[in-house]
Amino acid sequence: MSWLTDRLRLLAGLIAVAALAAPSLDVWAQQGDAPKKPAQQAQQQQKPPAKPRPAPTKPGQSIASKTEALPPSQIGIGTLAKQAFMVDPQTSTVLLFKDADKPMHPSSMAKMMTIYIVFEELAAGRLKLDTKFRVSERARNMGGSRMFVELGSEVSVEDLIKGMIVLSGNDACVVVAEGLSGTEESFAERMTKKAKELGMTGSVFKNSSGWPAEGQWTTARDLAVLAWRTIDDFPQYYKYYSETNWIYNNIKQDNRNRLLRTTAGTDGLKTGHTEEGGYGQATSAIRDGRRLILVVNGMTSMAERAQETSRVMEWGFREFTNTTVFRAGDTVAEAPVWLGTQDKVPLVVPRMVQVTAPTGQAVSPRVIAKYDGPLPAPIAKGTKLGVAAVTLPDGRVIEYPLEAGADVPRKGVLGRVTAMIGHYLFGWWS
């Protein structure tokens, strides 16, 4: 009967703790999980080490991972581009890969990074759309495509954004670079640093406009990463990329992105051209809520660039579809709760979870909910509690956050003591 005596002593101790030191019990319940039984601890220690698995990534992040994987069907398409990269950013599925990690000249597609930094400054409140920058002689004398800013004039940030996007103004880029960093050289260093932060490991910038310069490189994949981060990070400013023409200084110019006028759903981003690198374009289009991003480079003419970009984009929408695994707010699993008024809490996805596969192919992704449980109460609705690991058709694992789908208050003192007594007295057989 010694075990019973020990249990009764423990019972008396717990009651004393509840009566005299309830606040301490509250803190313990918030900071830790429910106590494990000795038998469980022994079993856990005897388990062999798990086999290493590929590290999972978050949606969007795996666009930058060095993979050439296509969906299992290996549906392919030839392209005239020297470099090409197409991705569904919402599922991180690569649909087309051709020398996408090979260094290439960024040309005017480098302006996307200058614009990204401007958007970042606006979102942080360090800039306003009506903030004005003065035009230097260096900016005024820039060659190539221009906004036609006048020496000594002051131009608003909003006009400079349109000048960089719609008019592809090299002069506008220099005005921005000098306004934000003092010199274009310093701004280029900032561009390269930001590229590394975004996962653009193959990009080095030497100026703000993409003007040919020794040692300036990017990759098709890197530009796709930048395109997606622009769309996802700054939806309130991305609208500028869809403007088809603009008048500045009494000069009307059309956006060089012809797909804005010819290909359904196109809403950005940027074209580019250098003698050595050829004609290139980073394009994004959305149809029925599904977005594709395509980067091509090395075309021989503006016409070929427009035709090839449109053809490949149509192929991507036609040959692949997205299957919804979970809608926003759907419950993926229920997790046990320790010392809560409810025994379980629903784990929900805050955003839609989809899988990309060839059109007509049945999709049955494997989904595993990961969390550390039991989860200690109280739990507030919307609190991140774990992840849903979704295995895609190409074998990659993407992790989506799981949040509490409901509030779970903590039990009162008597309820907590009762739960703890039950755990210690009867946990052996539970």
Spell out what each predicted region is.
Residues 18-27:
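C-terminal segment of classical bacterial N-terminal signal peptides
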Residues 1-12:
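Bacterial N-terminal signal peptides that target proteins for export
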Residues 32-221, 228-234, 245-249:
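Active-site-adjacent loops and short helices of periplasmic peptidoglycan-processing enzymes
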Residues 15, 70-72, 280:
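A generic local structural motif
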Residues 201-204, 212-430:
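Domain-terminus/edge residues, biased toward the C-terminal soluble/receptor-binding domains
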